[in-house]
């Protein structure tokens, strides 16, 4: 029996390249990549190049935890996190006092002179006084300027605002009180004659025919009415003048504001302002009488429908 020997397998060119590539990778994996790279670069060069380090031999960075083990942090109060922020008021609905303060600061430098005093003839001062009168507060007297309006002291400004609010409250309070008194007195006078004097409501035209008779129920009624009106008007003027509210109520008139604006162009109007203010005061007093007469007319009109 003859020995049979196997001939070595013939490797193809592709397999040779693959084996060569695997051997090269194995050498580089052993840390020889840098030497091989320098050997290749130095071939064909008469000058020795500097050492080059292969990226395969560079140490790969390892991920390290940056967390520092320390004590547990302080626990924050949940009320500080969960509490909602204060609501922001809508545009245009801010506090009126804050708006007045801003407007006051804007004109403060223009109102005050070089010596820090207020010039009564300054048109800006007059405009500010008109705005102050329009808010329903006790405005300054004729020809006077309230320098405390433009004070830099916030305490003084707060005091002036509180004083204005108090004067406005006093005006409304006393006017409402006198209104109740006027209505009660007029109704009492009317129903007293209606219930106690038979001829007061005997006919639709009894208040005309009774003028020629012995009893004059309508004349007596108007006599008591006139007496009550005089007493009420005098008390109204006394209370408002004593509290300093009578003049303040007159200064809120649109006529006085127009005259104050016109006096910037025609200074002669300042001469007539006291007269107009006095006329407006009398007009308010007569308005009380006219209002009570209107109530009497309504009562007599209702009386004419009862018979």
UniProtKB/Swiss-Prot annotation:
Check the record and name the InterPro entries matching this protein: GET2, Get2/sif1
UniProt entry tagged with the keyword Transmembrane: yes
Show which residues sit on the Lumenal side of the membrane: 195-220, 306-307
Query: Quick one: where is this thing mainly located?
Result: endoplasmic reticulum
Q: Where is this region: Disordered?
A: 41-73
Q: Where are the transmembrane segments?
A: 174-194, 221-240, 285-305
Q: Which residue stretches are annotated as topological domain Cytoplasmic?
A: 1-173, 241-284
The entry's cellular-component GO terms read: endoplasmic reticulum membrane; GET complex; Golgi membrane
Q: Name one GO biological process term.
A: retrograde vesicle-mediated transport, Golgi to endoplasmic reticulum
Q: Topology in the membrane?
A: Multi-pass membrane protein
Where is the protein localized?
Answer: Endoplasmic reticulum membrane; Golgi apparatus membrane
Polar residues composition-biased segments: 41-52
Record keywords, A-Z: Endoplasmic reticulum, ER-Golgi transport, Golgi apparatus, Membrane, Transmembrane, Transmembrane helix, Transport
Read off the PANTHER family from this record: GOLGI TO ER TRAFFIC PROTEIN 2
Please give the family membership noted in the entry.
Belongs to the GET2 family.
Write down the HAMAP family for this protein, in alphabetical order: Get2 (MF_03114)
Summary of subunit composition and partner proteins: Component of the Golgi to ER traffic (GET) complex, which is composed of GET1, GET2 and GET3. Within the complex, GET1 and GET2 form a heterotetramer which is stabilized by phosphatidylinositol binding and which binds to the GET3 homodimer.
Q: What does this protein do?
A: Required for the post-translational delivery of tail-anchored (TA) proteins to the endoplasmic reticulum. Together with GET1, acts as a membrane receptor for soluble GET3, which recognizes and selectively binds the transmembrane domain of TA proteins in the cytosol. The GET complex cooperates with the HDEL receptor ERD2 to mediate the ATP-dependent retrieval of resident ER proteins that contain a C-terminal H-D-E-L retention signal from the Golgi to the ER.
Protein name in UniProt: Golgi to ER traffic protein 2
Q: Which organism is it from?
A: Candida tropicalis (strain ATCC MYA-3404 / T1) (Yeast)
Whichever gene encodes this chain, its name is GET2
């Amino acid at each position: 029996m003859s020995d049979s020997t196997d001939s070595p397998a013939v490797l193809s060119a592709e397999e040779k390249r693959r084996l060569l590539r695997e051997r090269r990778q194995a050498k580089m994996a052993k840390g020889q990549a840098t030497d091989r790279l320098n050997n290749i670069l130095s071939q064909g060069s008469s000058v020795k190049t500097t050492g080059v380090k292969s990226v395969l031999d560079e140490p790969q960075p390892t991920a390290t935890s940056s967390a520092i083990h320390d004590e547990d942090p302080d626990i924050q109060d949940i009320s500080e996190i969960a509490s909602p922020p204060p609501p922001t008021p809508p545009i245009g609905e801010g506090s009126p006092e804050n708006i007045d303060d801003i407007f006051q600061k804007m004109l403060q430098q223009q109102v005050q002179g070089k010596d820090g005093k207020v010039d009564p003839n300054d048109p800006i001062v007059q405009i500010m006084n008109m705005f102050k009168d329009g808010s329903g507060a006790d405005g300054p007297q004729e020809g006077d300027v309230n320098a405390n309006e433009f004070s830099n002291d916030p305490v003084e400004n707060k005091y002036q605002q509180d004083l204005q609010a108090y004067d406005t409250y006093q005006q409304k309070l006393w006017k409402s009180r006198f209104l109740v008194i006027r209505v009660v007195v007029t109704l009492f006078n009317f129903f007293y004659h209606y219930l106690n004097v038979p001829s007061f409501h005997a006919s639709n035209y009894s208040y005309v025919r009774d003028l020629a008779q012995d009893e004059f129920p309508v004349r007596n009624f108007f006599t008591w009415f006139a007496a009550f009106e005089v007493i009420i008007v005098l008390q109204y003027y006394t209370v408002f003048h004593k509290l300093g509210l009578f003049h303040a109520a007159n200064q809120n008139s649109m006529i006085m504001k127009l005259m104050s604006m016109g006096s910037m162009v025609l200074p002669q109007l300042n001469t007539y302002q006291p007269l107009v203010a006095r006329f407006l005061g009398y007009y308010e007093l007569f308005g009380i009488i006219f209002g009570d007469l209107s109530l009497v007319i309504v009562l007599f009109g209702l009386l004419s429908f009862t018979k």
